[in-house]
């Protein structure tokens, strides 16, 4: 890498005197290509809740750093992941999500594959000299169910998710005891014109909550709000109050808790006040200035109550657009001649509810991949 793309090993190591990345790290295609290979091709990436693949033949597809991935539960109930391309000539095999047939058929030349990825039939292969059926299967990648969610990893030498996020599953289950019962209730898909790190930076602080999220801020008790850092994950937690602008809570519950987890590299798990539902922000970087996001909302019941429907609409029409407008504006502003190139990370000694020390922790981790 060129000198402009390197960062010192101790970058943001001291959050009390920290500045953000130089702006090139948010805009450069060279930086993005490096991060794509050094970070995303070698990390566990969360792609969905386990309930989306609850039954045999269930499958989903995801696009991660330009790779089309299919995750499928076989007839044997085993979870598997593959690159979603035919080994013959590269045509994509499955689209969207749903229930697969007992074989996967390529739309191009009708090669068929069993749900374990092995080749079932290649038309005319008996008449093709030295055709290698064993080497014509779908190409697998690692997949793991962890903490009630599905993770994939393109690194064939990767160890388990727990090694990447030690202690996270236990803490998440403490925050939300109904994870295994959750079901997808809503998904907002956006191709956001912002670098993936801009989006994480925004999540890693509540300094902006008062000015930019008035409804959310009306429910959050900022004087009872903490942000703790762990190994490759952080936790923002505290106590809430009922608000007509956002969360309408049971008045008999004193100081209901909320939890917001960021996990390396860029998935955010939220347990709102009440602890009986979750929202998850899945980030799938596309290029230096574009990130595909799935904002998923999960409840335990399939037939939604009116309050739940109203809450979904609040997320859709109020809370979600507030964050999208913020990160899109930042991405534009970073390229201005009026931006001095780095911003001061506003960490206070008390590590209060509005302190930005979470950003410093995240940026220090990223810096280790830019030596």
Swiss-Prot record:
Xref: Pfam families: Rieske, Ring_hydroxyl_A
At which positions is Fe cation bound? 208, 213, 323
- Catalytic reaction list: (R)-carnitine + NADH + O2 + H(+) = (3R)-3-hydroxy-4-oxobutanoate + trimethylamine + NAD(+) + H2O; (R)-carnitine + NADPH + O2 + H(+) = (3R)-3-hydroxy-4-oxobutanoate + trimethylamine + NADP(+) + H2O
The UniProt entry's GO biological process terms, in alphabetical order, are: carnitine metabolic process
InterPro entries given in the database record: Carnitine_monoox_A (IPR039004), Rieske_2Fe-2S (IPR017941), Rieske_2Fe-2S_sf (IPR036922), Ring-hydroxy_dOase_2Fe2S_BS (IPR015881), Ring_hydroxy_dOase_asu_C_dom (IPR015879), Rng_hydr_dOase-A (IPR001663)
Q: Which family does it belong to?
A: Belongs to the bacterial ring-hydroxylating dioxygenase alpha subunit family. CntA subfamily.
Which SUPFAM superfamilies does its entry note? Bet v1-like, ISP domain
**Is Iron there in the keyword field?**
yes
Q: Where is the Rieske domain?
A: 44-152
- Identify this protein by name: Carnitine monooxygenase oxygenase subunit
- Protein residues bound to [2Fe-2S] cluster: 86, 88, 106, 109
Knockout mutant characteristics = Mutant cannot grow on carnitine as a sole carbon and energy source, whereas the growth on succinate is not affected. Mutation abolishes trimethylamine formation from carnitine.
Q: How is the cofactor bound?
A: Binds 1 [2Fe-2S] cluster per subunit. Binds 1 Fe cation per subunit.
- Source organism of this protein record: Acinetobacter baumannii (strain ATCC 19606 / DSM 30007 / JCM 6841 / CCUG 19606 / CIP 70.34 / NBRC 109757 / NCIMB 12457 / NCTC 12156 / 81)
Alphabetical UniProt keywords: 2Fe-2S, Iron, Iron-sulfur, Metal-binding, NAD, NADP, Oxidoreductase
**Pathway entry:** Amine and polyamine metabolism; carnitine metabolism
* Stated role: Converts carnitine to trimethylamine and malic semialdehyde.
Tell me how this protein assembles. Answer: Composed of an oxygenase subunit (cntA) and a reductase subunit (cntB).
